Curated annotation (Swiss-Prot):
Primary localization class, coarse: membrane
Name of the molecule in the record: Uncharacterized lipoprotein YsaB
Family matches, as InterPro entries: YsaB-like
Location in or out of the cell: Cell membrane
Cleavable signal peptide: 1-17
Lipid tethering residues (S-diacylglycerol cysteine): C18
Keywords of this entry: Cell membrane, Lipoprotein, Membrane, Palmitate, Signal
Transmembrane parts of this sequence: none
Membrane topology per record: Lipid-anchor
GO cellular component terms given for this protein: plasma membrane
Organism: Escherichia coli (strain K12)
Chain residues carrying a lipid of type N-palmitoyl cysteine: C18
Amino acid sequence: MMMNAFFPAMALMVLVGCSIPSPVQKAQRVKVDPLRSLNMEALCKDQAAKRYNTGEQKIDVTAFEQFQGSYEMRGYTFRKEQFVCSFDADGHFLHLSMR
């Protein structure tokens, strides 16, 4: 009885070891048009200034990154209050999150 289960298990292990490795998948990086990123930054500063009741000149945007088909801009106010602006894949403003 033990031998009947042993041979199929060994055959399975040998076949698994012979399979070719799957190719490594890499995240796609899309280069953002500079004009679009500047427009997104201006919109982010405008929305943050309204949310924090301050002027756009007192808002700093520090990071811009692509994240799962959308974009995020991180920044802070002159009072060191952090926020994140989110944009869709086309660069349209989605929301501002206070951190």
